[in-house]
Swiss-Prot record:
Signal sequence range: none
One Pfam short name: RTP801_C
Native source species: Xenopus tropicalis
Name this polypeptide is given: DNA damage-inducible transcript 4 protein
GO annotations of cellular component type: cytoplasm; mitochondrion
């Protein structure tokens, strides 16, 4: 009997054969211009929901009017609870943005933009291991061929970011004649005016723990 056991224990099961997935180039050719523009931007302001300048300092009386729709696909209670606070912080960053290159005093953010952005953030964070808490968000405003960096937001500083979202916002196209006038004349001190953002935007998602291709979604 011992001899039989020794013979059995001497047998070994061959290890499984693992095929390594080919490394894919992260930035596709169609995104090269966006990556080059955003990579050359000056260092942006950093914000966090857990920092001292948190969303609790925001004075948004009309925020309760914005609500996120229920969806069976977005069953992340923690993310849904966190999202309104994150949108408050995003709105505060856009309101405080240093936009001297646009020669306007402030950006106007439509509620439709924030509502659509909230849905998109939940959608892109749903498959992530830490959900929305693992997001690193870069806010940018496109005008013409330029891309102006507004702020970088770390949703939760206690969590190592697992994915990066670059939100590309656009100015309202109906304001283009006014914008052309701003760029065609010399700047006048104190002549800045408000410019409204378009409800549409584009989001670029990069997984920081994977070599998967860049995900681009436009709303």
């Amino acid at each position: 009997m011992p001899a039989r056991w020794d013979t059995f224990s001497a047998l070994s099961v061959p290890p499984p054969i693992l095929e390594e997935e080919p490394q894919s180039q992260f930035w596709g050719e169609d995104c090269a211009d966006v990556s080059q523009r955003c990579s050359s931007l000056p260092s942006s302001d950093c914000e966090s929901l857990t920092s001292s300048n948190s969303y609790s300092e925001c004075d948004l009386d009309a925020w309760d009017e914005i609500s996120l729709p229920d969806s069976e696909l977005l069953n992340d209670p923690e993310g849904e609870q966190l999202c309104p606070s994150l949108l408050k912080l995003i709105k505060r960053c856009l309101t405080k943005a240093k936009i001297n290159s646009l020669r306007c005093s402030r950006l106007l953010i439509p509620d439709e933009l924030l509502c659509n952005l909230g849905q998109e953030l939940l959608h892109l964070a749903y498959s992530e291991p830490c959900g929305l808490r693992g997001a690193l968000i870069d806010l940018c405003v496109e005008h013409g061929k330029d891309c102006h960096s507004v702020a970088q937001i770390t949703v939760d500083q206690a969590v190592v970011p697992t994915f990066q979202l670059t939100v590309l916002l656009r100015l309202d196209s109906r304001l283009w004649p006014r914008i052309q006038g701003l760029f065609s004349t010399k700047p006048v001190p104190g002549s800045g005016q408000s410019l409204k953002l378009s409800p549409g935007f584009k989001v670029l998602k990069k997984k920081l723990y994977s070599s998967e291709e860049l995900i681009i979604e436009e709303c």
